[in-house]
């Protein structure tokens, strides 16, 4: 891999230098890179950045009775994003608007990735959520989740991620990766059963953050 250090926004705090690190893959696969904490970003070409990535370790998941009861009320299907873009995009755009999230530009940029699949979640035949993800060889990489805000008791954000993690397990794959996990931006990820974080050298349990 070709490593790039971006000093354009770099700075020094207490005599420590902070800058961004990126890589352009050479012979590495997607799985190789995400297993080492790198995350893809669409650029010409695709470059990968280092962040506090997180993943769901299925062997460490322990679901509460409440969560199991919620999951029992839901069904999901795995579909190709290509061909249902209009339906999925409309659901996501409405979700962004209702949550007042300025994410449409990033969502559209991510739509340029190849091999995007969609998990469609339903309750009593009504669509209550979508999650887009990339189906890799050894793992899956979750991208974005949107859900119906009229079902707060279902905790559909976390529940959708757990459903996708279970689908990953049923595929006999290793883990579901779900991008960054910084607590000031993604506090809900700290609550996901089985969550692990990339600390720069190895994967660690969320217990060290409690």
What are these regions (language model features)?
Residues 36-37, 95, 99, 192-196:
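Alpha-helix boundary/capping residues
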Residues 52, 187-188, 208:
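Short Asp/Glu-rich motifs
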Residues 52-54, 119, 176:
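Well-ordered beta-strand positions enriched in small/hydrophobic/aromatic, beta-favoring residues
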Residues 44-46, 66-153, 183:
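A conserved beta-strand-loop-helix scaffold within acyl/acetyltransferase catalytic domains
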Residues 16-30, 115-116, 127-197, 203:
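Acyl-donor binding region in acyl/amide transferases
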Residues 1-75, 79:
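Acyl-donor-binding surface of acyltransferase catalytic domains
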Residues 201, 206-209:
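Long, intrinsically disordered, low-complexity Ser/Thr/Pro-rich regulatory/activation regions
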Residues 39-40, 102, 174, 195:
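Short coil/loop linkers at secondary-structure junctions
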């Amino acid at each position: 891999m070709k490593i790039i250090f971006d000093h354009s926004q770099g700075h020094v705090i207490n005599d420590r230098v902070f800058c961004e690190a990126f890589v352009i893959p050479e012979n590495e696969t997607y799985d190789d890179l995400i297993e080492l904490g790198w995350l893809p970003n669409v650029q010409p070409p695709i470059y990968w950045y280092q962040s506090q990535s997180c993943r769901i370790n299925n062997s460490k998941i322990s679901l509460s009775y409440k969560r199991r009861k919620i999951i029992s009320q839901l069904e999901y299907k795995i579909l190709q994003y290509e061909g249902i873009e209009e339906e999925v995009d409309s659901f996501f755009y409405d979700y962004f608007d209702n949550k007042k999230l300025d994410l449409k530009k990033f969502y559209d940029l991510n739509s340029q990735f190849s091999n995007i699949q969609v998990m469609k979640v339903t309750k009593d035949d009504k669509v209550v959520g979508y999650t887009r993800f990339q189906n890799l060889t050894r793992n899956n990489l979750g991208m974005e989740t949107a859900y119906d805000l009229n079902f707060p008791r279902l905790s559909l954000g976390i529940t959708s991620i757990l459903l996708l993690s279970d689908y990953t397990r049923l595929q006999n794959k290793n883990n579901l990766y779900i991008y960054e996990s910084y607590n000031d931006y993604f506090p809900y990820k700290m609550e996901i059963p089985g969550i692990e974080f990339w600390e720069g050298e190895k994967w660690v349990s969320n217990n060290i953050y409690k």
